[in-house]
């Protein structure tokens, strides 16, 4: 099974390119983040027209996650994480697809720090770890895919000093991510490229793409 994760940063604005990418690459499952639309605004027909079923967890103007599956509609298992009933951010969606448990994750950024946004990020990561443990206990094939907003190691960023003060690579958030690896989850990209130097994000400002000034914050954790 080919599983992809893609922070689309606004599904309506990038729908033509997203459809083009689906047709070109034909992933069996695609986890989307930052769809930035309410549930009723999700363009389901556009995906059905190219052979994909979908479920989604939307939010007006912010956040939002979705799971697309080729030739089937994912069977929803969970929407949101337990632990903070007052948390209304649409950041987590979980489904079964052809015998595999799939989660689409948009973890909080955490900037600026210190402060409530970073504290929220750490609490959210602990809630995710608890849910991951529940999935692990089911002893089923599973992948937790998405934008984790965490640079796990220095080899995952073009210049560690340039990002040293960012919430993406603070010791606390890195430790929370590594704790999940310690629980048994496998970082798929790191397993394939242990030397690092593989980026999933480049800032659109200051010519980051042209300079290859990127970092790795999008991860697929496998059971």
Where are these regions (language model features)?
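Active-site-proximal beta-strand elements of phosphoester/diester hydrolases
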Residues: 1-10, 99-114, 145
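Conserved beta strand-loop-helix elements of the APE1-like EEP
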Residues: 61-76, 196, 208-223
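Metal-dependent phosphoesterases centered on the DNase I-like endonuclease/exonuclease/phosphatase
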Residues: 50-51, 124-217
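Structured beta-strand-rich core segments of catalytic domains in phosphoester-bond hydrolases
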Residues: 35-38, 42-112
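N-terminal, active-site-proximal structural segment of metallo-dependent hydrolase catalytic domains
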Residues: 1-49, 56, 63-65, 180
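Active-site beta-strand/loop signature of hydrolases that rely on acidic residues for catalysis
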Residues: 3-7, 22-40, 102, 131-154, ...
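Active-site environment of divalent metal-dependent phosphoester hydrolases
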Residues: 11-13, 37-40, 113, 151-152, ...
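Surface-exposed cleft-lining segments at the edges of enzyme active sites
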Residues: 82-83, 108-125, 162-166
């Amino acid at each position: 099974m080919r599983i992809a994760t893609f922070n689309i940063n606004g599904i309506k604005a990038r729908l033509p390119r997203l459809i083009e990418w689906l047709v070109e690459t034909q992933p069996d499952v695609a986890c989307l983040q930052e769809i930035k639309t309410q549930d009723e605004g999700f363009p389901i027909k556009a995906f059905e027209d190219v052979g994909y079923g979908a479920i989604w967890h939307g939010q007006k103007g912010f956040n939002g996650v979705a799971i697309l599956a080729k030739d089937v509609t994912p069977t929803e298992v969970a929407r949101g994480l337990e632990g903070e009933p007052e948390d209304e951010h649409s950041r987590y969606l979980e489904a079964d697809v052809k015998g595999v448990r799939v989660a689409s994750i948009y973890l909080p950024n955490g900037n600026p720090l210190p402060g409530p946004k970073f504290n929220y990020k750490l609490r959210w990561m602990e809630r995710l770890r608890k849910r991951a443990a529940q999935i692990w206990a089911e002893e089923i094939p599973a992948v937790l895919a998405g934008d984790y907003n965490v640079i796990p190691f220095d080899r995952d960023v073009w210049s560690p000093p340039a990002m040293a003060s960012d919430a993406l690579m603070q010791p606390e958030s890195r430790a929370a991510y590594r704790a999940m690896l310690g629980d048994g989850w496998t970082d798929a990209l790191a397993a394939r490229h242990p030397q690092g130097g593989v980026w999933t994000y480049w800032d659109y400002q200051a010519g980051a793409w042209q300079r290859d000034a990127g970092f790795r914050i999008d991860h697929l954790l496998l059971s």
